[in-house]
Amino acid sequence: MVQQRHVLLITYPAQGHINPALQFAQRLLRMGIQVTLATSVYALSRMKKSSGSTPKGLTFATFSDGYDDGFRPKGVDHTEYMSSLAKQGSNTLRNVINTSADQGCPVTCLVYTLLLPWAATVARECHIPSALLWIQPVAVMDIYYYYFRGYEDDVKNNSNDPTWSIQFPGLPSMKAKDLPSFILPSSDNIYSFALPTFKKQLETLDEEERPKVLVNTFDALEPQALKAIESYNLIAIGPLTPSAFLDGKDPSETSFSGDLFQKSKDYKEWLNSRPAGSVVYVSFGSLLTLPKQQMEEIARGLLKSGRPFLWVIRAKENGEEEKEEDRLICMEELEEQGMIVPWCSQIEVLTHPSLGCFVTHCGWNSTLETLVCGVPVVAFPHWTDQGTNAKLIEDVWETGVRVVPNEDGTVESDEIKRCIETVMDDGEKGVELKRNAKKWKELAREAMQEDGSSDKNLKAFVEDAGKGYQAESN
């Protein structure tokens, strides 16, 4: 009897991990594969409270991170959280695997997102083949890989020199601002857990021969970077964005359906009332909180641009009320010129005819969505992989311009206005950016079409994973 394929998909409990994981699950479900998505108890409870529907046929499981009522960063070290996540998560993950086997639907392959190297260890103990779902550009994996293989001292000793640059295999020359923030010397210790976790991830992969790494990218987007690590089997299966905007296999799939935040209702009507290509969309993702001074500069920059805008400013979490000092000084003027919302379906905004450009933090999900939707951008990176993504946007794919901060690290209103005008105007640069954005839109869609590069790569992975399970279980 042929064993029903059952993929257990483990995702770190953050919006930027859940979204691509859900899209990956959707792809597998359409191939007739049973999928169980597991995330933390608290993250799943928040997903169920949001209005989005989840993919039909997808089953859910939870693991404990030790904070089932929600992790509160204040007063708790992130390193302590990651340690609890690894310990508690490993134990509960074993239970999920054992329960599935007892119910007659054993897990045949385990796939996990980054920051969860312990999931691969559990899979190995349970004799289940595993694969990492890398949800950043493969360029960033290349940087981490080579950083720990001979490039660390160069970065540590020279990255404070503004004239210094470095070139990793398969990548363009980069300055310090283009590198993942976690490898740069910093006084910010709140995320000191990150670099050791990435190192542990690579060490875990190195324990296997030719480990499989599924990457949320596509062959045409990062051709050299995908070949830069010979010891890994890097498999491009992206972009992991809703089907209606890509391959059309499911026209009803128009959102990610796993929001941890409640969406606003009325922004669509507002967009419908604006002229084509006129709106500036501003969003800095689900994690980043900007200083008040920077928020004021963005506000003034938007007002100076004179263009209608849709700006996502997340509401305070845990029911905290906004304090008077948090309120933007020019709020009345802002509300006259544009619209401010606490959350929205970004992919629906990016595909709206009224949209002209996206002022983005350059998180990888957002970056891919701009490419899929053919939207030029103002790149406004802050931390983690965002500087690398901004480098690729500006200098490799040439679909946007990057803001230049002042000496204090603040991006001033005039600079924001300059970048918006460069992208939105019909000058030579603006026309070129829009043309390139349209080109990448077509290439992204080609990759996900039937027998496109990513479609073929995913089918080959599924076929191979089935063989791997049979070998492990014999």
From Swiss-Prot:
Catalytic activity: crocetin + UDP-alpha-D-glucose = beta-D-glucosyl crocetin + UDP; beta-D-glucosyl crocetin + UDP-alpha-D-glucose = bis(beta-D-glucosyl) crocetin + UDP; beta-D-gentiobiosyl crocetin + UDP-alpha-D-glucose = beta-D-gentiobiosyl beta-D-glucosyl crocetin + UDP
Keyword flag Transit peptide: yes
Coiled-coil regions listed in the entry: none
Entry annotation: catalytic residues: 17 (proton acceptor)
SS bonds (residue pairs): none
MF terms (GO), sorted A to Z: quercetin 3-O-glucosyltransferase activity; quercetin 7-O-glucosyltransferase activity
Binding site for an anthocyanidin: 17
Superkingdom of this protein's organism: Eukaryota
Entry-linked InterPro entries: UDP_glucos_trans, UDP_glycos_trans_CS
Locations listed in the record: Plastid, Chloroplast
Tissues where this protein is expressed: Ubiquitous.
EC number: 2.4.1.271
Transit peptide: 1-45
Keywords in alphabetical order: Chloroplast, Glycosyltransferase, Plastid, Transferase, Transit peptide
Gene Ontology CC terms: chloroplast
Alphabetized Gene3D superfamilies for the sequence: Glycogen Phosphorylase B (3.40.50.2000)
Residue numbers binding UDP-alpha-D-glucose: 346, 361, 364-366, 369, 385-386
PROSITE patterns linked: UDPGT
Family as reported in the entry's similarity comment: Belongs to the UDP-glycosyltransferase family.
Function: Glucosyltransferase acting on a broad range of substrates, including crocetin, 4-coumaric acid, caffeic acid and ferulic acid. No activity with indol-3-acetic acid, bixin and norbixin, and no formation of O-glucosides. Involved with UGT94E5 in sequential glycosylation of crocetin to crocin (bis(beta-D-gentiobiosyl) crocetin).
Other noteworthy facts: Crocin is a yellow pigment that accumulates during fruit development. No other crocetin glucosyl esters detected in neither flowers, leaves, nor stems. No correlation between mRNA expression and pigment accumulation.
Protein name: Crocetin glucosyltransferase, chloroplastic
Organism: Gardenia jasminoides
Gene from which the chain derives: UGT75L6
